[in-house]
Amino acid sequence: MPCRILTLQSEAQWPLLGDMLAGRYDPDDAVEPVVRDILAAVRSKGDEALAEYTRRFDCPDFTPALLHVTSEEVAQAVASVPADDIAIIRQAADNIRSFHEAQKERSWFVTHDDGTILGQKVTPVDRAGLYVPGGKGGDTPLLSSLLMNAIPAQVAGVTSITVASPPRPDGTLNPHLLAAAHILGITDIIRAGSAWAVAAFAFGTQTIAPVDVIAGPGNIFVTTAKRMVQGRVAIDMIAGPSEILILADATARPDWVAADMLSQAEHDPLASSILVTTEPALAEAVTAELERQLATLPRADIARKALADWGAVVVVPDMDVAVAIANRVAPEHLEVLTAQPWELAGSLRHAGALFLGPYSPEPLGDYFAGPNHVLPTMGTARFSSALSVQTFCKRTSIIAASRAFAERNADAVARLARLEGLEAHARSAASRNSQQ
């Protein structure tokens, strides 16, 4: 049996599943001291520290001179990528851009009768640093993550975007990654990975300018580094391992449910794939399908461990309990494979993204549909949202008071200030009252 099967009669039995998942949230305390040393080294030594770490972990012959990718390298990479792949990347980028254009916020102003103008000014940050994992040996870079991070920044109006990705052992970056950057018009690309890339973004080096926002996925070293520099710079989120929860009734196809569960389980041994269903027969059929599909899956070892440790098939008496369990989990990806998925959508309050209906598999959203795939994990969808255009914007309040407004409210403001013991505040407000 690839994963445990649980039967929950009510939401009150949630701990049977919640306790199982709790272990995924435990931090690795051994990582933080290592990352702290990396941050300090890059802050002190800059490019040389980046080169030292890259020599140690990625490319044995790396030097500071290789940090920045040249335009000639990008041109060669683009020429080497099949035209069909270029077309697919362009289409995905167009879909993502179209969706995020709808997210754009605009500055707004309200004028009062006395002439006072109040408003909110929306401004993009100046610089963004985007991290793109290189994948296995640098040969499976997360192209989709580059698109999902860069396009919202561009739509927001960020004019300076730097991309960092670890090089392959020969010092090159994957041509498809460089082609994707070229399609997006990004020219500032550095060869650096892990926590030292995050450090370069946060502190800057001799040749890399510090940024205002750091975004992009990564392993525990990247995530820990982002957490430790947060406050000096903004970050997109603290993301954990991938996860999916599927709500399914008798109309769901077992082979599709199993395929969707495995789409997340193959990511990482810590990934979580959960089916919640009202149908015991579906639970049994999906379990059998998981075994059948695992037999031919290239990353079966990873998927098996993820399912064994963090996967579950949960049988519940009705969809009310199923929805309650889903809201408790607050998963990164929530698929609804039921006869009437839209009827449940309003009750599903906590999820990074909702995938409604049998033709909305999670990978469609991950790669191509348009909504962002950088999503809250580990239950944080209870209070946080997907990466968006807003990740790269800030909002500034505007107060342009008229003389009449200032004079009319001077005494009230002064009184509030004195209640807080702030006499200088009170005098500042009162000084605008010409009646005194």
UniProtKB/Swiss-Prot annotation:
Binding site for Zn(2+): Q264, H267, D366, H425
GO BP annotations, alphabetical order: L-histidine biosynthetic process
InterPro entries listed in its UniProt record: Ald_DH/histidinol_DH, Histidinol_DH_CS, Histidinol_DH_monofunct, Hstdl_DH
Gene Ontology cellular-component annotations: cytosol
GO function terms (MF aspect): histidinol dehydrogenase activity; NAD binding; zinc ion binding
Keywords: Amino-acid biosynthesis, Histidine biosynthesis, Metal-binding, NAD, Oxidoreductase, Zinc
Enzyme class: oxidoreductase
Record: active site: E332 (proton acceptor), H333 (proton acceptor)
A Pfam family of this chain: Histidinol_dh
Entry note: cofactor: Binds 1 zinc ion per subunit.
UniProt keyword NAD present: yes
Entry-linked SUPFAM superfamilies: ALDH-like
Functional note: Catalyzes the sequential NAD-dependent oxidations of L-histidinol to L-histidinaldehyde and then to L-histidine.
HAMAP family in alphabetical order: HisD
Family under the similarity heading: Belongs to the histidinol dehydrogenase family.
Protein name: Histidinol dehydrogenase
Organism name: Nitratidesulfovibrio vulgaris (strain ATCC 29579 / DSM 644 / CCUG 34227 / NCIMB 8303 / VKM B-1760 / Hildenborough) (Desulfovibrio vulgaris)
Lineage of source species: Bacteria, Pseudomonadati, Thermodesulfobacteriota, Desulfovibrionia, Desulfovibrionales
UniProt gene name: hisD
